């Protein structure tokens, strides 16, 4: 912990952001969301500040977390991945969303895509209930999730992950 000359303190952290080593000085109470936005990760959105919407979802050590609820100090020595670090996979899934017309206002897209990509890596042949549970933290204001499920079923089938009924 360092003093900043004004009576405050800062911490030095080192972490990997989208595969690149980063070194930063942060305030002990700084949230991961704020750090990521300062680093130019604009796919990370803040919609509620109460962990209710899922817009701020990122991966910490390959697991989805809500960056509005994680202290930046917790990423010291760890790997953080944002949508910017998953552009190839994200663009592939976004094509499915566009083809199916499931992308209306785009409010939920960042968190939804991050969770879908994490789920695809973690679960083989998920059931509809497993999918719903995995994506439960994503707030969608437009579609009621019907079109999201349709796109996800098609995506999983074409990726060879299928879906158990």
Describe each model-derived feature in a short phrase.
Residues 4-165:
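Signature of N-terminal electron-transfer/Fe-S-associated modules in redox systems
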